[in-house]
Each structure stands twice: as C-alpha cells, then as structure tokens.
Amino acid sequence: MAPIALAPTTNTRFVTKLKTSIVSPQPNTLHDVLAHAVERYPLHELGFITSSAHDSSIQTKTFSEFNQYVRNLARAMLEWGKPKGSVVVVYLTEHEDNMAAVWACLLAGYVPCLQPALSAQQAHKEAHVAHIKNLFGSAIWLTSEIGAEQISSISGLDLHLLSELKASAEKFNVAANWVAYEAKPDDEAILFLTSGSTGFSKAVVHTHRTILAACRAKGQSYGLTSESRILNCKPHVDLTLAFN
C-alpha cells in the first residue's frame, strides 16, 4: 500500500506544542534557572574576579561544579537550625563568595541580603548594624574572618563564618537538584539595601517573579543567547542575580 500523507491537524499541532513545553518549560523561580542551566549547559562557565589577587585574576567554575558547590553549602546552612524565610546578611568581599552565598541561601530557603562595605567610623557602623537588626527582626550574618573582626564588638549578632560553612559543606554530597523547599514565583528571593543617602538604608524586596521578568526583558532587549558573555556588575541597588 502506498504511504498516505496527512496534513497536521489542530490536535496534532497542540500535542506537539504540549510536548515541547513539557520538555523545555520556562523557569518560574531562580531554583529553576539554576537547574535548567546545569541540565542544558553543564560545561558552560562562570568567571569570578578575585579582588584579593594582585592581578585581579579570574577563577572559573562550570555550571555543574558551581551547582554542586552551592547546593552542598545550602545543605550545610540547614545545620544552623534557622526557620525558613530567615534573612541572612551576606557581608563578603570576593565575587565568588558573594554569589555562592546568595545562591546557597536561596536553595536553603533563606532570604539573602547583600551588605556593602561598612563605614570605618565605629558610631556609624554600630548604628547601621543595629538598624539592620531592627529592620529584619534578626541578626544572622554570613561573613569572613575580616568581616567578623569589623562587627565582633557589636552585641546581639548571630555570626557565621563562610570558612566554617565551607568546611561543614564538605560532609555533604547532595543530589544535583536538591533544594530545602520548593520556591514559588511570588516568594521573597533577595533583599537589596539602598544607599541610605536620605537616612538609614531601606530594604528593597525582589521576588523570584520580578527578577526573572527583569532578566527576560533585558535578554530580549540586548538579544542575548546562551553564547553571550555578561560582565555582571554589582551596584548596591542593581540585580546581582540578573545574569549570573
């Protein structure tokens, strides 16, 4: 029997479209972004500028390596015993450390807040830290040994060292898709502090939805593809996660 050519029907087109959407859904949360990046481009790299090096050298990690690293950090964070949604003030100087801490907080169910360099004036520094504590109703800080020295004289802070968190994370080897909880698009994702030029700093809340909307709009406007290279600058009120 000769083969019969059939024109695609509406149902056929619908099924084809449905299959495509199931195979490659649009990310709805930042958790999805990381998972999709690892699944589709495992060998693509993130480059981190090392500010402490004299030549500002760039260290790289593949998406797969970074994914495993931050998920292990996130699992180690749970050992702190903090409730879901707790705000963690991230006070670090190195590019990679900041990004790893932010992603680990997200995956652990915490809300990261990047803290810019504190004032060298003790009175200003103490006032700002006290304000942040009152603003968030907590005082969880993730920092380095140098950062801890700057704020160790301020009472009532729950300080955690990144070096100790890294050591704790070495005990874990979680699954490549491990998360402490499933995020929703309108969950708080990250907090940004304003400069405080008109008084004490205010916290700007960004949800998973708002960050992804900004990323999609910028990506379309600039014509970005999976081969694009992005220099991720970090102004105090910009989206640190935008193209990480």
Where are these regions (language model features)?
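AMP-dependent adenylate-forming
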Residues: 8-17, 33-62, 189-191
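Conserved AMP-binding/adenylate-forming core of the ANL superfamily
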Residues: 25, 44-82, 86-102, 120-127, ...
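Conserved pre-ATP/AMP-binding loop-to-beta segment of ANL
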Residues: 42-46, 170-193, 199-200, 205, ...
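ANL superfamily adenylate-forming
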Residues: 55, 129-130, 139-186, 200
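Conserved AMP-binding
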Residues: 73, 91-96, 102, 114-116, ...
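Short hydrophobic alpha-helices that are characteristic scaffold elements of the AMP-binding
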Residues: 78, 103-114, 135, 238, ...
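Conserved AMP-binding loop of ANL adenylate-forming enzymes
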Residues: 90, 222-244
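Conserved ATP-dependent adenylate/AMP-binding module captured primarily in the ANL superfamily
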Residues: 102, 118-152, 170-171, 214-231
